[in-house]
Each structure stands twice: as C-alpha cells, then as structure tokens.
Amino acid sequence: TVSVTLGPSRLGGSSSGVVVPDMDLLELPRPPSTSPWAYVKIAEGCDRACGFCAIPSFRGPQRSRTIESILAEVDVLARSNRSSGREGGGEDATLRAREIVLVAQDLAAYGRDQGIGQRDIIPLLTAVSQRVDWVRLLYLYPSDLTEALIDAILSTGVPYFDLSLQHTSRPVLRRMKRWGDGEQFLERIARIRELEPDAVFRSNFLIGYPGETEEDHDDLLAFMEAAQVDWCGLFTFSRESGTYAASLPDQVAPELMAERHAEASELAETITAERRLDRVGRTIEVLVDAPGVARSTGEAPEIDGIIAVPEDLTVGSLLEVLVVDAEGPDLEAVPVSDHTGG
C-alpha cells in the first residue's frame, strides 16, 4: 500500500492566489477491483459556489474525463476475471465488475467544461449500462435532475437516486447559495415514484447552517416525514476556512446543533427501518459482494445497508432472493431456489 498525500501548491511560487492541486486526481492510477463493483470517477473539481464548501478552492474547477477514457476503464473492470486466489481464500483476487458506480463532485455537469453539450451524462450513462449489469450515479444536484436524466436512470434498471439536497428551507438554501426548496424537491421525488414506485432515494442534510431557525429545522423534519427518503446522511455544520459560510452571522450554538442532529437522526433511522421492513416477503435480485453479504439495486456499496445471505453463495453472482427479515437498515434473504425447495 502506498500513501499519497495531496495538497495545494502555488504555480511558480507566485502570490497570485491561484491554487492548483499538486497532482491531478484524475491521473491517479486505479487499483484493480477486489469486489464485484467499482467506483469510476468521471470528473474532478467543481464549478459551483455552495456557501459551506471548500472543494473548489483546493480541487479547482470541474475537469471532465473524456468518454473514451471512462469507457476504456469500465471495459477493463468489466472484463477482469475472478482469479484462483479467491477460491483459495486469497484477499487480492480481482473480480469482474458487475456494477459500476459513477462519481464526481457534480455528476450531472459532466462534460460541460469540455464544451460538448449540456447533458453528456446521459449518453455516458447509457454506454456504461451496456457494458455492465448495474450502473449507479452518486451525488446529483436536484436542479439538474431533468426528465431526460430521470428516464435515463430508470432505463438502466437501477432506480436509485442520490440527491444532494442539503436542506429544505428556502431561506437556508439561499444562504447556502443553492437552488430549490422542500416543495420543489417533493415534486421531483413524487414524479420519480410515479414513474417507478420502487425507486430508492438517498440524500444528505446539513444541520445548523448559520441562521438556521427552529422553523427551518421543523421544515426539514416535515420534509423528511413527507419524502420518506430511504437513506439519509446527516451532518452538523462546521466552519471551513475560506468559505462564504465561515464569516456569516448567526452561527448556531454547538449544543443546539447537536440537539437538532439527534432529533433528525432518530427520525431518519425510523424511516429507514420502516422502509426496509416493507421489503420483507418480496423477491429481489441481489449481487453477492462478499461471503454472506449481498446488495440489491436499492443499496449503494459501503454507504447503505446490506442484505445478509448464505455464505456459500458465489461472490460476484447475481441471483433472485426472498427477503425474510429486516433489522434496522439491513435485510436477511435466502435464494428463491432454496425457499421453494428447487
């Protein structure tokens, strides 16, 4: 294992204030996948100016990879064969990727910096979906969730929507320099569920942004109840040096932030548990990630719950299972053939 430390440097040692990365993260070599899924980064940096975020200051503006380079990487991952080391218990076996997870700071903005159109994520998504069984998008801005993109995601057979909402109160979102409000977000979610009732949603919310009132917090809780987001990440605000939010007035006291975070977390955990319980008794397709561990299209790797399955199922296989139990964010399932005696 090689540790790589990336930090900002100034071009030519000048004091112009232009900060660039020491190494373009897009040029880092990708290690082979030891799981039947893999992340593929399609762009680095971000052109947005969210009030709480320092990413543009140290990763720079968005730089998209070419479609050709992305597809070449996907092809390599999709062709890799399971090595004999896996059968013998080796930990460095390389698996063929059955799922590709596309990631970027601003995924739907892919290609705009190259001047090749406003919706290049759609043809890229389509091309990747033709190479692997599942393709998943992580981190979509709600303002970019067009009907065309919704249709493209649903057509892949992975109805999973990771939406970067951050809050639902219009005043808070405007102080964050972000688009939308809870009502607009609910309309998008309802539209997707109208098209695909089994669609799964993930989002992150920032608690205690400067100026957040009790009314704002209640607005967020009401949205969570109404939206029934399956997977919810909750974070408390912390000042990032150099960001717009760092110098805003009306900073929320840490004790109050912690109280609001606990309240929202309890609600989020309850919603997740209830939505998982609704899956008991259903037959779903899963990908076996590791001995005894699987996921369906409704769980992103590493960040969502898992599905416990018999340990003798082949890692990297896709199969139908019957969900027999739920505990919090996790499910338990058995192969359909076992349950039917076939």
Locations of regions flagged by a protein language model:
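Proteins enriched for Cys/Gly/acidic motifs involved in redox and nucleic-acid/cofactor modification
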Residues: 1-82, 89-91, 95-111, 182-194, ...
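Short, hinge-like loop/turn segments at secondary-structure boundaries
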Residues: 118, 153-155, 220, 249-252
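Contiguous mid-protein beta-loop-alpha structural module that forms a pocket-lining wall or clamp
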Residues: 212, 228-229
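Terminal RNA-binding accessory module
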Residues: 236, 247-342
